[in-house]
Amino acid sequence: MRMSVGLSLLLPLSGRTFLLLLSVVMAQSHWPSEPSEAVRDWENQLEASMHSVLSDLHEAVPTVVGIPDGTAVVGRSFRVTIPTDLIASSGDIIKVSAAGKEALPSWLHWDSQSHTLEGLPLDTDKGVHYISVSATRLGANGSHIPQTSSVFSIEVYPEDHSELQSVRTASPDPGEVVSSACAADEPVTVLTVILDADLTKMTPKQRIDLLHRMRSFSEVELHNMKLVPVVNNRLFDMSAFMAGPGNAKKVVENGALLSWKLGCSLNQNSVPDIHGVEAPAREGAMSAQLGYPVVGWHIANKKPPLPKRVRRQIHATPTPVTAIGPPTTAIQEPPSRIVPTPTSPAIAPPTETMAPPVRDPVPGKPTVTIRTRGAIIQTPTLGPIQPTRVSEAGTTVPGQIRPTMTIPGYVEPTAVATPPTTTTKKPRVSTPKPATPSTDSTTTTTRRPTKKPRTPRPVPRVTTKVSITRLETASPPTRIRTTTSGVPRGGEPNQRPELKNHIDRVDAWVGTYFEVKIPSDTFYDHEDTTTDKLKLTLKLREQQLVGEKSWVQFNSNSQLMYGLPDSSHVGKHEYFMHATDKGGLSAVDAFEIHVHRRPQGDRAPARFKAKFVGDPALVLNDIHKKIALVKKLAFAFGDRNCSTITLQNITRGSIVVEWTNNTLPLEPCPKEQIAGLSRRIAEDDGKPRPAFSNALEPDFKATSITVTGSGSCRHLQFIPVVPPRRVPSEAPPTEVPDRDPEKSSEDDVYLHTVIPAVVVAAILLIAGIIAMICYRKKRKGKLTLEDQATFIKKGVPIIFADELDDSKPPPSSSMPLILQEEKAPLPPPEYPNQSVPETTPLNQDTMGEYTPLRDEDPNAPPYQPPPPFTAPMEGKGSRPKNMTPYRSPPPYVPP
């Protein structure tokens, strides 16, 4: 070309035109016309020396196009059928493996009978996986001769990928999924079965077989199921509104969650019939079908994943400016040939090299650099090998080499900054038709969460050409070998760690222990690599460390954050996670901990209360002792997951601890389960069992335990055991629609307890009143001997006129008793000069009354005196008035 240009300056215009056309024809003759699309893409980048290699490559192993790329979602089944008839002919051997490797990824399984590739990816399998399908034929000497090959990709999306997209990807009928999909802001009702299994220990075939067995048991299609491992020991969902037990007595493995969708925004009344899950899970039929113990099940409403807000982290980045100095010329490097060693096929991972930024306070005139192009040719092997880069010593900065995603095998150069010691300006490097713009080496001022970098698609046995920009100074050239690993190279400054994935938000509940393991991909450092190699520190605002008494604690050795909030911590709390590398530089991630109130509230079916020896202040003021108490209580119940215990209260009176068990369903009353848990920890009289005491000692010594019902079981007492009450037999109950179970239990209490007690009390009261009246009445008609004697002594008998016998009149007590032989007395002597008393008229009247009687009735009976009294007469002064006078006795008649 230089000769042509030189001659064109000397020849006339017609000669110049002829030479120009001749040059164009010669240049076109160097490029063959290939129908392949890959050759058409590379015809502006490959030199003539590469055409023979490329032609041999296409003739040796033709690439078959026809296997489309696939996508998979974490926790959902993946299945693709490989069209082997397009790849292999009769007698060929099909080999499926990861591109450049001998085996498939750990989550994929190849079924040679059905020619299907299936598997179930986990969270650690996110990213792009390239699968190579090759056909080989057995040669005469026993070696395998490659025939055809094809490479396709499978991209694994995270679990919180769009539900509609993930289900549509796995479902054979997209129309069915669209019809049953929920609205964008509508929660999805999910039924989850908790299995005592470890997915990381299963082979891909065992995971798929587990889904097939659940499909035959529950009649739910595979594309609707999701199988993920338990994270942070959270076996149970605190937001579940229905739950039930399984047949597993205790959890041994890490645990697996197998779930499927029931509907949209369902509640307890609108949930479809789940008897096919509830009874088999409890009785063991589901465990026998699946081959793994069933811990329990629950139903909860899952809100659709909302886009996370983007946090920005500001770094102290310099501003690139031009440097002052004379123009320099980049020296052209002669082409060098790098021959890789004949090793096993391997795919080079994408690498990224960050060059140091350029800062100069004085702007100047930009220098002129000449862009050169060095040809690095790679010998074709079974798998593309990343070539090592050769650069000049001194202050030469190697160019950044990164494969693009669309042009196979082409390594895209990026702009490289010059260190401050040189006098050149950062060159502007251009690439021919790049599919993706190159990344500048300077650090940007904002950072966004990035996904796993998508690796380029490998193409079997294709050579690559690398375009490298060289910047040199006057130092003598010396060959050095550079790598792109994470180990710091000599002379490069330490770079601060970068925040890759935000922690963003942590949810916790009052009284429930939580723990969060910081993922290893949260931060990344170019020298120290992943997060587990960095030193993490949890701080509050203004660089204040979290105290020992804080309800949130962080273990920097295991990089585990844990805590136990109480009711005073309800709300949103902001914390900062600092990651520091060995050089002392750090990065910060701000995240929030949202503390929610107890989802069950006061509706827990049972409350467990235990009394321990000790001072309650020692437990209340020490978060570590509270956490240890919760862990020991969970261990006493046989649960490895501490989130099954919700601490309600710690009060005085030694140490009185009240808690609830989150594994118990709210409705209906789980009487048998509560009784089983009660018998596990306490005797019938409330004394703790030895197993419970051994689980909590020596830190906590229990003295008594009480288990009382609450919520749907509030009318029951479990510990201490109450003697059973005799309940009369009843007829089979009639189903009454829309009857409240709580109201029914209240009616039973009134019917069997309150009403009989009131009736018995009323009967006893009436009987007492009747007995008292009868006693008073009987006592009123009887007198004692003393009362009778007093009556006789003090009283004078009164004889009424009607009571006298006229035939035989009683003798008069006023007349003297005269016998029959008795003679009349002598008349009284008369004395002379006797004065007549004033009462003479009375005596005279009296004598006059008696005298005629004696004269007229001489036959009158003699006088009979009354019988003598047994007691002396007392109190004769009280004689009643208006007494009927006695009739006078008959007159006395002398014989």
From Swiss-Prot:
UniProt xrefs under SUPFAM superfamilies: Cadherin-like, Dystroglycan, domain 2
Motif (Nuclear localization signal): 776-782
Comp. bias regions, Basic and acidic residues: 736-746
Transmembrane segments: 750-775
PTM note: Autolytic cleavage produces the alpha and beta subunits. In cutaneous cells, as well as in certain pathological conditions, shedding of beta-dystroglycan can occur releasing a peptide of about 30 kDa. SRC-mediated phosphorylation of the PPXY motif of the beta subunit recruits SH2 domain-containing proteins, but inhibits binding to WWW domain-containing proteins, DMD and UTRN. This phosphorylation also inhibits nuclear entry.
CDD domains: alpha_DG_C, Dystroglycan_repeat
Effect in UniProt of substituting T192M: In MDDGC9; results in impaired interaction with LARGE1 and incomplete DAG1 glycosylation
Impact noted for substituting D111N: In MDDGC9; does not affect dystroglycan expression; impairs alpha-dystroglycan glycosylation
Effect of Y892A: Abolishes phosphorylation. No change in plasma membrane location
Region (O-glycosylated at seven sites with GalNAc) residue spans: 463-485
Any Gene Ontology biological process: protein transport
Region (Required for laminin recognition): 30-408
Effect of K823A: No change in nuclear location
Glycan attachment sites: T63, N141, T317, T319, T367, T369, T372, T379, T381, T388, T455, N641, N649, N661
Low complexity composition bias: residue spans: 413-447
Feature: compositional bias, Pro residues: 724-735, 859-870
Keywords: Autocatalytic cleavage, Cell membrane, Congenital muscular dystrophy, Cytoplasm, Cytoskeleton, Disease variant, Disulfide bond, Dystroglycanopathy, Glycoprotein, Host cell receptor for virus entry, Host-virus interaction, Limb-girdle muscular dystrophy, Lissencephaly, Membrane, Nucleus, Phosphoprotein, Postsynaptic cell membrane, Receptor, Secreted, Signal, Synapse, Transmembrane, Transmembrane helix
Region called Required for interaction with CAV3, residue ranges: 819-895
Start and end residues of each stretch annotated as Mucin-like domain: 316-485
Ranges for region O-glycosylated at one site: 169-200
Region (Disordered): 381-460, 478-498, 724-746, 823-895
Phosphothreonine: modified positions: T790
Illness association: Muscular dystrophy-dystroglycanopathy limb-girdle C9: An autosomal recessive muscular dystrophy showing onset in early childhood, and associated with intellectual disability without structural brain anomalies.
Entry function: The dystroglycan complex is involved in a number of processes including laminin and basement membrane assembly, sarcolemmal stability, cell survival, peripheral nerve myelination, nodal structure, cell migration, and epithelial polarization.
Protein name, as recorded: Dystroglycan 1
Organism: Homo sapiens (Human)
Lineage: Eukaryota, Metazoa, Chordata, Craniata, Vertebrata
Gene field: DAG1
